[in-house]
Amino acid sequence: MDNYEFSELLKTLKNKVGNIASIIKPENIQTRLKEIEELENSPSFWSDVKQAGIIGKEKTKITNLLKNYENAFNALNDASELFDLANSENDTETLEALFNDAPKLEDTITSLEISMLLSGENDGKNAIVSIHPGAGGTESNDWASILYRMYLRFCEREGFKVETLDFQEGEEAGLKDVSFLVKGENAYGYLKAENGIHRLVRTSPFDSAGRRHTSFSSVMVSPELDDDIEIEIEEKDIRIDYYRASGAGGQHVNKTESAVRITHFPTGIVVQCQNDRSQHKNKATAFKMLKSRLYELELMKQQDSANAGEKSEIGWGHQIRSYVLFPYQQVKDNRSGEAFSQVDNILDGDIKKMIEGVLIALKAE
């Protein structure tokens, strides 16, 4: 990097921060935080626990947004002032240090962009994730289990907690179906970008001839709904089946039919839960999963309508990403257009940067 490239980078980043400031209006956030502080000091505030909880979540969200904005604004100002000073004094050592820190400065601005993009109504919610293998038997089942591990590692990296709701092992390898709840700040905001079809190209470990195989798995992500959001489900529209649970490695195998499957006829959505030994609890969780899926489906319909009939880029039926392990190694996202060569790292859960690229690309459209 040289002086010209760094000065152009500063201009680009200043424009970004300026645009973000005009959207989030930091002064309005500060005013709102003062209002919340006054509310919290009122003796009657804590008498309504539910409302206090809602305002508490709002406070956390806008405090983080303001903090990210101030960090980005200050880092950019400091870099700009230091750059001007180093240039005037022909201080090559300081200039070199600024050039080396340029990626870190870009990451700070990206962090601000992402916190702004994750300010939607549902982004802060927990996420319910389901992975279903496509046609192809063992190949697809194995691919689904690789994706499952990738998301578990991602959650581990981000400090998200994971609760398995349903797990069905494949007959020879991998899994037939898995659903899990991801708990943590902005879990849905990040993972909603994973909605869609994931394609794998590799030399099959199950093919003695070592031929190249293509496998598909679908990932479905929906927000865990608060109890106060009402989704009407009519009894005539569903079928409830009960069966014996059979978890991974024989875990929680029950002699009673505690596992629950609900089929929703109008949409074709099927949800299953065998997380608990109690049929009653599994049924309640399965209904919660169904409501979340129906809610997500409605969000997609609204998005399609808002786009005047254009296809939504976050949808259960769209191929969103290709993972090629042979004849070369590359992961390419169809929405951001970005390609990554660190395939092993990605399959080990290092997907945050890739997801952020998708969120930024979709916002720019």
UniProtKB/Swiss-Prot annotation:
Modification N5-methylglutamine, positions: 251
PTM notes: Methylated by PrmC. Methylation increases the termination efficiency of RF2.
Transmembrane region(s): none
Cellular compartments per GO CC: cytoplasm
Keywords: Cytoplasm, Methylation, Protein biosynthesis
Major subcellular site: cytoplasm
Source taxon at top rank: Bacteria
Signal peptide: none
Keyword Amino-acid biosynthesis: no
Compartments where located: Cytoplasm
Entry GO MF terms: translation release factor activity, codon specific
One of the Pfam families matching this protein, by short name: PCRF
Family from the record: Belongs to the prokaryotic/mitochondrial release factor family.
Function: Peptide chain release factor 2 directs the termination of translation in response to the peptide chain termination codons UGA and UAA.
Protein name in the entry: Peptide chain release factor 2
Organism for this UniProt entry: Campylobacter jejuni subsp. jejuni serotype O:6 (strain 81116 / NCTC 11828)
Gene that this polypeptide is encoded by: prfB
